[in-house]
């Protein structure tokens, strides 16, 4: 009789205490997410549109280079009005934790992909806390998905362009 109670108690403890105790830890994403909103008519002849992130500010045309470029999104389809993204899901070049000085949406009209500054036109810039006087810094801590990195692209009122 005591053995029967013992088995019931042990079975009950095991049954009720196994609530995912050995389940894997949830995957922690490192990156950023947000929404890109396009206002106005898309320019004719655009061949590609991407979200791009640069580590250092673009103070000269020389800063627009492959070593400074730290993230490139998948292509945003022509004519899109709203593009929601998560860098973990939409990366051509994945981003790591760190501090980044320039987050923008840029377009190109050349038939082939080019890394020359003259071939890209910035149509939207990330500004922190609504301060449109300078690009916002993106700070991504390790194992953190930074949310609400939203960019407005107004084709009738484009942002200042980085140096050519």
Residue ranges and their predicted role:
Residues 93-114:
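A short, solvent-exposed beta-strand micro-motif common in secreted/extracellular proteins
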Residues 22-28:
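Membrane-proximal, proline-rich intrinsically disordered regions
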Residues 59-98:
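Tryptophan-paired
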Residues 109-157:
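Structured interaction patches on ligand/partner-binding surfaces of diverse proteins
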Residues 14-17:
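C-terminal motif of bacterial Sec signal peptides marking the signal peptidase cleavage site
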Residues 30-38, 51:
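A short, amphipathic beta-strand motif
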């Amino acid at each position: 009789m005591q053995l029967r109670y013992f088995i019931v108690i042990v079975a009950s403890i095991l049954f009720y205490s196994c609530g995912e105790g050995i389940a894997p830890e949830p995957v922690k994403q490192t990156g950023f997410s947000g929404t890109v909103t396009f206002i106005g008519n898309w320019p004719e002849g655009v061949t590609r549109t991407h979200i791009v992130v640069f580590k250092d500010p673009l103070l000269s045309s020389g800063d627009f280079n492959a070593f400074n470029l730290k993230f490139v999104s998948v292509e945003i389809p022509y004519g899109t009005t709203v593009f929601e993204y998560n860098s973990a899901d939409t990366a051509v070049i994945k981003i790591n934790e760190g501090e980044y000085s320039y987050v923008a949406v840029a377009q190109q009209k050349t038939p082939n992909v080019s890394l020359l500054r003259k071939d890209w036109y910035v149509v939207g810039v990330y500004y922190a806390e609504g301060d449109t006087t300078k690009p916002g810094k993106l700070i991504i801590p390790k194992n953190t998905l930074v949310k609400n990195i939203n960019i407005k692209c107004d084709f009738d009122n484009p942002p200042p362009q980085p140096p050519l």
